[in-house]
């Protein structure tokens, strides 16, 4: 059986789609998969089992990239095409069955929309795939012996970024002798590129003892690092979704984006909202004290979740 899975360009959306993909793998244990996704999101799928091909979409003018992708896929007879991009390509391929998500924005969480595409209830939660070498790298970076608080102070939009000084002060409080994680190590994650580095630099400067992992790991290694975290606290970003998928207690910080649509998903994941109407708040209006109390509550909640 051959399944074509057309996922997203952005890391966060790609991570959210892994639950649906994991469901397909369980439902069709004999199937082989081809994944089409954005270049940046490719690392989300690189380690998945039964992967035949991973095709990166490099955008072209006039959407000519889809013509190139079609050329790579048209000679295969597919058993199922799942298209999460609502592109025309799924209609132009030979397949026994196709599932194409409806375009446009709709109320409700993205996971619910994805699950409805295949009629799955409850919505399958995102997962991560890593290799032993990824776990070994993570273990070397975040050795056992003390807990690790991982911060994600970056985002793809400056308005989604919580003030750097609040990240730093929160980390110091959580790792203080009377904090939730006394003596814990602090690691700071972010993607490659100058923008990510510039967002993370003020936090790194304020926390000179922190482990700087910004732009230094690929996505499977990042996932393995997050799987070792005692807690992840970060802005609404792909890292936040990856942390929740990795099983880390995850606190997502939300202001101008709707947490009811894109909040972190999982039994140990929560969103903390800034003041103002949902999805219309300013990150400056998210008090540090609110995040601190949410972190304490989440740790208590996570302790009740079966391993």
Q: Residue locations for each model-derived region?
A:
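Catalytic machinery of carbohydrate-active enzymes
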Residues: 1-307
């Amino acid at each position: 059986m051959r399944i074509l899975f057309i996922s997203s360009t952005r890391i966060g959306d790609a991570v959210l789609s892994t639950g649906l993909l994991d469901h397909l793998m369980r439902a069709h244990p004999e199937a082989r998969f081809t994944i089409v996704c954005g270049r940046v999101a490719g690392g989300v799928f690189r380690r998945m089992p039964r992967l035949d091909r991973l095709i990166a979409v490099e955008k072209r003018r006039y959407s000519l990239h889809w013509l190139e992708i079609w050329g790579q896929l048209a000679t295969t007879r597919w058993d199922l095409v799942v298209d999460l991009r609502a592109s025309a390509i799924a209609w132009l391929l030979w397949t026994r069955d196709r599932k194409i998500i409806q375009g446009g924005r709709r109320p409700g969480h993205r996971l619910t929309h994805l699950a409805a595409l295949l009629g799955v209830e409850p919505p399958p939660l995102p997962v991560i795939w890593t290799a032993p070498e990824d776990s070994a790298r993570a273990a070397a970076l975040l050795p056992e012996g003390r807990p690790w608080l991982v911060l994600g102070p970056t985002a793809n939009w400056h308005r989604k970024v919580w003030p750097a000084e609040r990240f730093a002060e929160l980390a110091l409080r959580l790792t203080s002798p009377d904090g939730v994680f006394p003596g814990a190590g602090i690691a700071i994650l972010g993607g490659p590129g100058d923008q990510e580095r510039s967002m993370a630099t003020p936090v790194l400067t304020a926390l000179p003892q922190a482990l700087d992992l910004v732009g230094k790991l690929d996505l499977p290694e990042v996932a393995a690092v997050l799987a070792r975290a005692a807690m992840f606290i970060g802005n609404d970003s792909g890292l936040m979704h990856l942390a929740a998928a990795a099983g880390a207690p995850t606190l997502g910080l939300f202001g101008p984006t709707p947490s009811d649509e894109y909040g972190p998903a999982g039994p140990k994941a929560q969103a903390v909202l800034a003041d103002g109407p949902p999805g219309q708040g300013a990150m400056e209006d998210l008090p540090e004290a609110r995040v601190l109390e949410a972190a304490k509550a989440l740790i208590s909640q996570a302790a009740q979740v079966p391993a």
